[in-house]
Regions:
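N-terminal cap/lid segment of alpha/beta-hydrolase-fold proteins
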Residues: 29-71
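Catalytic nucleophile-loop/oxyanion-hole region of alpha/beta-hydrolase
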Residues: 114-142, 147
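Gly/Ala-rich beta-loop-alpha elbow adjacent to hydrolase catalytic centers
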Residues: 149-158
């Protein structure tokens, strides 16, 4: 009996001391984008050029209204969902931007759009939010007011940003991911959670 208790206790100890996802920092200030509007497209292209495995059509890009690098009254930022890309909203987001005479930024959010044997293995909620936060900062550079258009988990990020950044003028959400409803969703937050959900 003592041996069983000892083995069980050891198992519990190993489980509780296993790797665990760190609690993310949800609310942060927007990063400073030092490039001016004439340089910002090149700055984005330079950042994307650091990756040699971006899937075609998944790269971050700005579409200027009338192809002129000039700040518009409104800008749009499209936040794609988990495992998605800006193609998810095509052509609706671009059509709406054209109707509103606005510039639009289509970011590739953190760890997305890459050719990899293990896609999104580096993904964390905090880094995903950080990249959405940068996208909002870019949106402010290219428009006086920013509309966030989003799909699925992109809506999760957009709601978080809007809660902390009143400069968000409006949200346009399609199929928002507000809450995970799977009964075992908590497993991912437990020690060894990443390894368990990958099985």
């Amino acid at each position: 009996m003592k041996k069983v208790v000892l083995i069980f206790s050891l198992f519990i100890l190993i489980f509780l001391t296993g790797p665990k996802v760190e609690k993310p920092v949800i609310f942060k200030d927007l990063p400073e984008i030092k490039s001016n509007i004439d340089e910002i497209k090149s700055w984005i292209d330079d950042n994307e050029s650091k990756f040699n495995n971006i899937k075609e059509g998944n790269e971050s890009r700005i579409i200027f209204h009338d192809s002129v690098p000039k700040k518009t009254d409104l800008s749009m930022v499209y936040l794609h969902g988990f495992s998605g890309s800006s193609q998810d909203g095509f052509p609706v987001h671009i059509n709406i931007a054209q109707k509103l005479n606005s510039n639009i930024y289509l970011p590739r959010l953190f760890a997305h759009g890459l050719k990899s044997s293990e896609p999104l293995i580096e993904y964390t909620g905090e880094k995903y939010l950080d990249s959405a936060r940068e996208a909002l900062a870019i949106g402010k550079k290219i428009g006086e007011k920013v509309i966030l258009m989003c799909t699925s988990t992109g809506c999760t990020a957009a709601l978080t940003l809007a809660a902390n950044h009143p400069e968000v003028e409006a949200l346009v959400m399609y199929a928002p991911n507000i809450r995970i409803t799977h009964p075992l969703d908590f497993v991912a937050t437990l020690p060894w959670g990443l390894y368990l959900v990958r099985r």
